[in-house]
Amino acid sequence: MENTTTNPDVLERFLRYVQINTQSEDANCDQVPSSTVQFDLANVLAEELRELGAEDAHVTEHAYVCAHIPASAGAEDKPALGLIAHLDTTEVAPGAGVKPHIVHYEGGDLVCGTVDGKPVAMSTAKLPALNDLAGEDLVCSDGTTLLGADDKAGVAEIMSLVARIAQDPSLPHPALGICFCPDEEIGHGAELLDIDTFGCKYAYTVDGGPIGELEWECFNAAEATVCFEGQSIHPGDAKGRMVNAGNLFCDFNALLPYVQRPEYTEGYEGFYHLEGVSATVDHATARYIVRDHDAAKFQQKLDLIDAAASMLNQRLGEERVTVEIKQQYRNMAEIVRDYPELIDVAKEAYLACGVEPQVLPIRDGTDGAQLSFRGLPCPNLSTGGYCYHGVNEFVPVSSLVKMTDVLQELVARFA
C-alpha cells in the first residue's frame, strides 16, 4: 500500500499532542484519572473526533475518550472493531514542557539535544536498530524530557485514520469504536471502560514499539510489598537486642535470585524488580514487581517471596517480616490464543504495507491484557517508537505514516 499522505496529518497531530502534558501519578493511583492534566488532551481529542463526524464523542468523568464511527457501505453487518491507545505518559522521566523537533539522522550517534552543554545522545552500540534508520527523519524531544510517543504516537495514528475515513467514507471499514484511556502507565488504563457501551467484538491497542511489532502475549504481573519491623537500641548496648530492619531487608533481598533481575533477563525470562525501598533501624519497606509469562513460574516466584519471609521469621523466632501481594494483570495469551484470526489479519495488514511483522512477547502489560480477560480480545500493535520512558525516546516520521496505513489496511480486512 502506498503512502497516501503527502503532508502527514499524523505528524501534525503527533507534534501537537506531545506538547500537552498528560503524566499519570502513581501516588494518586486510588483515583482515575490519577492526574487532572489528562483531561487536557482528552478534551482536545473529543472535540477533534466530533469535528471528524463522530457525533457521540465524549469524555467520561474518569477521562476516557469514547467515540464510534459508522461502518462503510456494505459493512454494516460486520462486527464492530475497537482501536485503543492511552492518554498518559510515564512519570519516571520529565514529561512536562515537551519540545519536539525533527532530526534528519545520517548515522552515528543520534543527538536529540544538549543539556548543560553536553549532548543527549544514543549510540548505535546501545541501540543497534539505529543502523537501519540512517536517512530517516526522526521526531525527538530536546533532551530535557521524554517525547511521549508512548502512547501519543498511537493516539495520533488512530486519529489520522479517523481523519482519512472522514475525508473518504468509502474506505472499507466496519463500525469502529475509538477509545483513549487514562492511567495505562500505572496499570489502570482499561479498568473503567464500559465494554458493553463500547460495543466491539474485537479490539487492538496501538501501544507497541518499532513498526511491525505484533504482540499477544504479556507478563503475568504482581506487586509485592514487604515490611520489616526492627528494634532500635543504642548501638553501644545493642548486642543481642537490636534488630536492624534495614539489615533484614538486605538479608531478604539476597534470598531472591540475583540472575532474575530485569537487567539480566530477556524474551520469556521473568524477573523480580526492586522498585523502591525505605529503611531505618525500626522499620523498612520494600516494593517489588514480579513478572513472568509462564503462569507456573510466576507462582513459583511469588511462593519464593513468601518462603524468604518465612525463613527470616524462623531465624528470628518471631514475625518481623510480612508480605502483601497484589495481583496486577495476567498473560492475555490465555484468551487471545483462541482468536488466531486477530493475529493473522494483523500480519496481513503489515505485509500489505511492506512491513515485516515481528511477533514478540510483551515484556510488560497493556490495556489489552485487562480487556481480554473482561471479554474483549485485544492484541497489541506497534506505534513505531523507540526508547520509551526516557529522554532519548524518538519515532521515525515514516513509521507514523506507515502505521496509519497499516491501520487502514487492518480495518478494511474486517469490513
What annotation goes with each model-predicted range?
Residues 247-264, 271-273, 320, 330-378:
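Active-site-adjacent substrate-binding region
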Residues 7-35, 140, 329, 389-390:
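N-terminal capping segment at the start of a domain
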Residues 159-166, 251-258, 409-412:
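Short glycine/serine- and small hydrophobic-enriched flexible loop segments
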Residues 26-28, 56, 170-175, 258-273, ...:
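Flexible, glycine/charged-enriched surface loops at secondary-structure junctions
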Residues 29-78, 82-84, 88, 99:
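A non-catalytic alpha/beta surface segment that caps or lines the substrate-entry region
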Residues 75-175, 180, 200:
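Active-site metal-coordination/substrate-binding segment of hydrolases
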Residues 127-130, 136-149, 183-306, 310, ...:
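Midchain, well-structured core segments that form catalytic/ion-binding scaffolds
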